[in-house]
Amino acid sequence: MAAPSEPAGFPRGSRFSFLPGGAHSEMTDDLVTDARGRGARHRKDNAPAAAPAPKGLEHGKRPCRACVDFKSWMRTQQKRDIKFREDCPQDREELGRNTWAFLHTLAAYYPDMPTPEQQQDMAQFIHIFSKFYPCEECAEDIRKRIDRSQPDTSTRVSFSQWLCRLHNEVNRKLGKPDFDCSRVDERWRDGWKDGSCD
């Protein structure tokens, strides 16, 4: 959401090609934007009226960068000879990868035998985290999964395995392969047994 001192965002009725889930709108051909989707405006004033914007892309709001992957958005744009900056806000895929890396590393360094207070704090952290995750569609999905399978914070191993199973559920939903949960410590704490991380 734009700060009060920032421009209002996009003109009324504008639609974007970087919709949640990578959906494509037929209404995007008349928009002019920069390489990151900023400054959308119509090429011509007589463009047809757009359907209501999906949740998160309403009038006056900047598009949710964390809600869509950059590649999906770029496929809908004209070919450009622009080198993209590396210090731009993360897209949905980058945010997801970095979030899972953080969570798995957090679980890998969780105490082997946590105190009751640590167990409660970690379970609470996971619940709060799922409420504030920037991609609302993703956050809602994680909350539903957590409701079905509460975080097991009783030990480091239990928590790491619970998180790996949760991640594999999401991977299956996205058509990605499962990770072998017996190897979480190799991946996130100790390094691969072949010594390639030493």
From Swiss-Prot:
EC identifiers of the protein: 1.8.3.2
Keyword set includes Oxidoreductase: yes
Protein name as annotated: FAD-linked sulfhydryl oxidase ALR
Residue ranges of every copy of the ERV/ALR sulfhydryl oxidase domain listed in the record: 88-188
Gene: Gfer
Family matches, as Pfam families: Evr1_Alr
Binding site for FAD: 92-100, 104, 133, 164-176, 187-188
A GO biological process held by the record: response to lipopolysaccharide
